Amino acid sequence: MKKYLMAFLLFANLCCDAQQAGKHVEIPPMPNGKVWKDTKGNPINAHGGGLLAHNGIYYWFGEIKKGKTWLVPDQQWEDYRVPAGGVSCYSSEDMHTWKYEGIALPSVTGNAKHDLDTSKVIERPKVIYNKRTKKFVMWMHVDANDYSYSQAGVAVSDKPAGPYTYLGSVKPNGQMSRDITLYKDDDEKAYIIYASESNKTMQVCLLSDDYLSPTTSYTRITSAINREAPAVFKYNKKYYLITSDCTGWSPNPATFAVADSLLGEWTQGGDPCTGTGAETTFQSQSTYVLPMPGQPNTFLFMADRWNKTNLEDSRYIWLPLQMVNGKPVIKWVDK
Ligand code: GAL
């Protein structure tokens, strides 16, 4: 018995040393909806996020949700909030073992006029790389607690994991900008895609060559229903846009739209999710879609399973998205 205990203690000690030295440690597969941990064993805190693939490394950026959740009084919807915690970054070579890189863009304390003050909203950060300027550019949704500010914020860095320097925020072409994503096309042109006009339209706006400001080229995607949580990808020269309905932190069905050009006509396509749970996007909300390297028909669909009364405890749902007869199909898998 004593021998086994000694062996166990030695093993536990080795694991601990490996973690402290930042070496590879065995991490269980990422079970959807369970707490996911980084290489140090801490819960991954990167919500409403996106991935950047750069020089063989994946960087995961997301909202830091930390602290007590409270309900903003006198709102028309369940406006649950935590202090705006800035943007975190994790890195991985295998999309499975995630190393915490630190806070890529910190929030600001005690300056209520600043976009990044902890009293505000910093959501859905995404990062792309500009080959010409050699800068990493982050766009995000910045807002007031009641969502009346509705602006797109931009930050820049020389290194993928940051730190990022905040440059300010805009209403692109005078248009409201809430839930946002960022897309870089094969021709190096980049676009922001954001919920606008009180979520009645999604808009796509071409960015300047340095990716730091919106141009006047933009399009309004209208549909019968309000949309949020945009995620864009390209397949066989067509563009696909997955969005959610607008029910705050509560899940709802996803839909997709398809277009021949990002600024072109978008056609509504229906619900990409199928099987039990499809009607709530498997209790989650879209945030990003990443092409899987070496698997031309397969994408990674990233979504958030929000815990509205304890936002810090929100979870991640990553599912395979398969293109079948020109349509995206998302099915549940356990991990
Ligand atoms: C969601 C939106 C989230 C967050 C939330 C607040 O629908 O997609 O990013 O803003 O509303 O209620």
Regions found by a protein language model. Give the residues of each.
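Bacterial Sec-dependent N-terminal signal peptides
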Residues: M1-G22
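Carbohydrate-active catalytic/glycan-binding domains of CAZyme proteins
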Residues: Q19-K335
